[in-house]
Amino acid sequence: MTLRYNSPAVQLSLLALTLLLTTAVRRLLNSFLMHEPPNNINLTYDSYLPTSIISCVAGFAGIFLANLAGIRSILLFYSFTSILYLSSIIVVYQYDHYTFHTACNIINSAAYDLSRVATLVVVLAYPNERWKARALATFLILEYFAMTMGNIIAISDHSSENSRLHSTIAALCLACLSPFVAVAIAPTHDVVRNNGVYLIARKTTLRDEIKETIRLFKNKYMLLLLPYMFCYPFLFGVAYIPFPNIEAIVLYDVGRLIVVFTSQMLDVQWASRRTRGLMALLVTSIFCTASSILTIVMRRAHMDLSGIKPSWGETEILAYVMDIALSEYAALMYATYFFAGVASSSVEFYGFWVMGTLTNDLKASARFVGTFHSVMSIGGLIGIELVTEIPHHYTTSNSLTYIAFGMSLISFMVLFVVVQSITESNDWTLGRMRNSSAPDTLSSPDGSSETVAVIAEVKYQHHNNV
C-alpha cells in the first residue's frame, strides 16, 4: 500500500525523527556532557525543586497549547529550545558561565514536557486500534533507550573536556536539523486514517479550553484515574532507592522494556478490548506489587550502621549504606532495580493506553494526557520532598513506604472501574456529541469506530477558511 504524506504512518515517522534529534540526543548526552550521573530511580520528578515545579506547570500548559497552538508549533518550539540548550553547554565549556545554561535548561525542560504531552496525544490518536499499544510502547522505549545509553556513558566515560566539547558541537549540529523535520509535520486535521476517515480535530478557543478543562475534573473517568496517576510515583518518591552502580542502571532500564510484552497483550486480537485491558491491569498490578514488596524488603534488610561517623553528611552516609547493601544483599538489590524498572514503565504505559481507549477526540485526549503527566510529576515530587525531611530516610523510615504501597493498591482497584468501561470503539467523547439525525457509526476493518455525524460536524480543513 502506498504511503500518503498525510497518513498516520508517515506523520508518526516524522514525529519519531524529530524526537531522535531532540529528546534522544539530550537524553543520550546530557549526563555525559554536564558530568551529572543519575542518582535515583524516580524519574517522574527533577531533584531541583524550581525545575520540578516548572515541569508540573508545563504539563498542564500542554493541555491548552496542544489544542490551541497545535502539535507542530509545540515541536518547533521544543526544537529551538533544544538548540539553545546545547549552545548553552558550549558557553559553559568555553567561558565557565552557568547563568545562560541554567535559563536554557529551565526553558528546554518546560518545552520537553510540552512536547511529551503533544507526542503522547498524537501517538494515542494516529494508529488504528490494533497498533495503538505497540506504537505507544515504541515511543516510550525510544526515550528509555536513549536515557539508558546516556546513563551508561556518563558513569563509564573518562573523556577529556575537549572531547566533551566536540561531542556537544556534534549534538548541536544534529539538533539544528530538528526544526526542518518538525515543520514538515502535518496539522492534525489533515491526517487521514487508512479507512479514509479524517481524525477528529475540532476548532477551539482559549475560553472553551478553560471551560472544558474545568469540566474534565468533574468527569467520573478522570476522578477515578487521578489516584492511579498520583500514587505509584508517590511510592517511588518515598521509597527513594538510589543507583549504586552501572549494573543497577542497566537492570532498571532493561526492566522498562517489558512494556513490549504488555503492548503485544493489548494489541493482539485474542479477546475483546475490555478483556485485554483487564488482563493487562492484572499483569501491571502484579509487577507493581512485586516491585513494592522487594523495595520494602530491601529497606528492612538488617545493616550494621555502627560505622557511620557523626561528621558525615548525607552523601557519605548514602555511599556507606550502598556499599553494605551491595556486599551483603546484592541479589536482592539488583532484583529490586529490575522490578522497579518493570513497574515504572508499566504504570506509565498502561495509564496512557487506558486514556487512548476512552476517546478518539484529540482535544479531549490532550486534556487527559496533560493532566496525567503533571499529576505523576506532582506525586513523585511530593514523595521525595516528604522523605528528605527525615534524617537518614533510606535506612530509618518505612512508615511512608507502607502508606504509599497501600495507596497504590487502592488506586489499582479504582482503575478497575475505568477499565470495565472500555468498549470496542473509543465512544466516550463521541457519545456526548452524537447527532441523532445521521447514521450512528462507520466501522473500519482495523477494529476502530468513528461517529459519522460527529466527523461531519467537527472535521474542519484549512481550505474551508480560504
Where do the protein language model's features map onto the residues?
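Glycine-rich segments within core transmembrane alpha-helices of 12-TM secondary carriers
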Residues: Y48-C56, N108, Y112-R116, P127-N162, ...
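Membrane-interfacial loop- and helix-cap regions that link adjacent transmembrane helices
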Residues: P8, L12, V25-F32, V197-V369, ...
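Helical-face signature of the major facilitator-like transporter fold
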Residues: L15-T23, S52, L86, H101-D113, ...
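Conserved MFS/SLC helix-loop-helix module at the cytosolic interface between two early adjacent transmembrane helices
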Residues: V57-D96
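Cytosolic juxtamembrane N-terminal segment immediately preceding the first transmembrane helix
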Residues: M1-V25
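A membrane-interface helix-boundary motif in multi-pass transporters
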Residues: R72-S73, S156-C173, R273-M279, I384-S408
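Symmetry-related core transmembrane helices of the 12-TM Major Facilitator Superfamily/SLC fold
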Residues: L140, L165-I185, V283-S291, N398-V418
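Non-transmembrane, juxtamembrane loop and terminal tail segments
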Residues: M1-L3, V191-T213, S425-V466
